[in-house]
Amino acid sequence: MLGYEKDTVAVAFLFLTRTRTRRLKALKIFEQTFASFGLDVLEYRDVPVNPENLGSSALESVPVMVQAFIKRPERAKSMLSFDKRLYTAKQLTKNKLFESELEDSLFFTSLSAKTIVYKALTQSRALDDFYLDLQNPAYETRFCLFHRRFSTNTTTSWDKAQPFRLIGHNGEINTIAGNRSWAKSREKMIGAERNEILTRDGISDSGSLNEMVEALRYRSSIPNVEDILAICMPPANHENNFYKFWSRAMEPWDGPALITYANGYTIGARLDRNGFRPCRWARTEDHFYLSSEAGTFDIAPETIDAKGTLFAGRGVTVDLSNGNVLFRDPSHSRDNYDAPFDPRVEKIPAKIEAIEERFDDKKGVFSFTDDDLSKVIYPMAESGKEPIGSMGDTARLAVLSTEVRSFFDFFYQHFSQVTNPPLDYIREQVVTDLKVYLGKKPNIFEPKELIPPAPAYEVDSPFLSLAQMDFIYSCIDNATDMDRVIPYVIDTTFDINHGTVGFKSKLRKIGEEAVQAVLNKHTILILSDRKASKER
């Protein structure tokens, strides 16, 4: 349809600002940056659209839509090298747009030699009315990833519409704040320039996941998108070394979430370990269908060879080169089955020794109330029961309280409570995982074959027993350079007579001490309040 031979060009689908001067400046940066990588823009094509079906807000913000055809350079011998070159050029372009204060003037809807993303701020049934390309009978494809869903957590816009360049997402990422913080730290690991970021501000949780999947696809040694999604969304209570190895380097992106993807080589989906988003599939002799709901496609029942449900922590991949449908776990794939994955972890003994020492005199120091003890702590410690005191808190915010409050009362978790189904304590054991690894976090962008991870300790819960804490403290004196698991204790208390000035000074010193400890090769930091008393 477009007049180019297969695999000779890539198509960049661009959303551009309607302000002409800013649009021309952004396109100039785009062309020059891509040309510096040997990626010459052959021509631009105005995407034919029919805006009559758009709503008022969508019509007010509709961007200029252009497709740029980019020639594959001769030095890009493989499609993977071509894809990596395109990704690197895109990242540098975004960096330069940021420096020129033009970051909102150009958005890469898609950039690939295999896929083109058509998305709009419109109802799904009106997509082919808006994009006239989708009405053209010459426009054929072997596969399609179609997304229809409104945004629940962010104000929607044209760039936030789905799918993104690699993935489509149904659900939420409730760990997104931590995921974004780790992404920021990884920018230092990969030696990114000051303004080159793995995931930028002002985008949705789905957009952040897409950018991380892209980064891992084109910067790391992880071979396939299905592997990347399995690493980002591992099954609960996994015991095989593949997941242990990668879980040390990548924190989970927890949903509830159903993630679909398409890169032109494979198309597939993965359900996160909570399993709270429906996913139904059906296979006929000629087609494979997957959707959030059964009945989305009008399939004659007699033509269905097999059908089923995608379960929590599982995925499916369709190989577009041969049509094979694979439900196997990526840890058992041909690339990974015989590969050595040594997580280099050792379990800390969880046995709790008899403790004679009492800490009743500390209750007042830490502002524990009788309700905290009788309704929360004692029932949980003695019988493992749910804390009945957690059902609502009508007390005023700690920062506004005239009473002395616990330090922990000043912090709250932010998550999408309204949209999440309930999780009972029985099912919780099956679909959640509390494992924590203590030690140096490996760089997921380093080739795993060349640089084995430093040793670490594995614990089954983020709550450590006193015996486990004593074990970690014992490593301070016994650790050697060969162990590479070297704890460091930072005292977090300060003289109460120094008041607010002392508090601020201590916070600054804690940060400085933590940085210096890491520079001195310590791999576990213990923030200790054991010296807390009436004076500190």
What residue spans do the PLM features occupy?
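Conserved structured catalytic cores and adjacent interaction surfaces
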Residues: 499-502, 517-536
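Active-site mouth loops of central-metabolism enzymes
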Residues: 490-511
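Short acidic loop-to-helix transition motifs that present clustered carboxylates
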Residues: 150-152, 495-496, 532
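Conserved short alpha-helical segments that host acidic/polar catalytic motifs at enzyme active sites
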Residues: 1-450, 465, 477-483
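Structural preference for beta-strand elements that scaffold enzyme active sites
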Residues: 487-489, 524
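Phosphate/ATP-binding catalytic cores across multiple sugar-kinase/actin-like superfamilies
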Residues: 252, 505-521
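C-terminal accessory domains/tails appended to large, multi-domain proteins
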Residues: 468-471
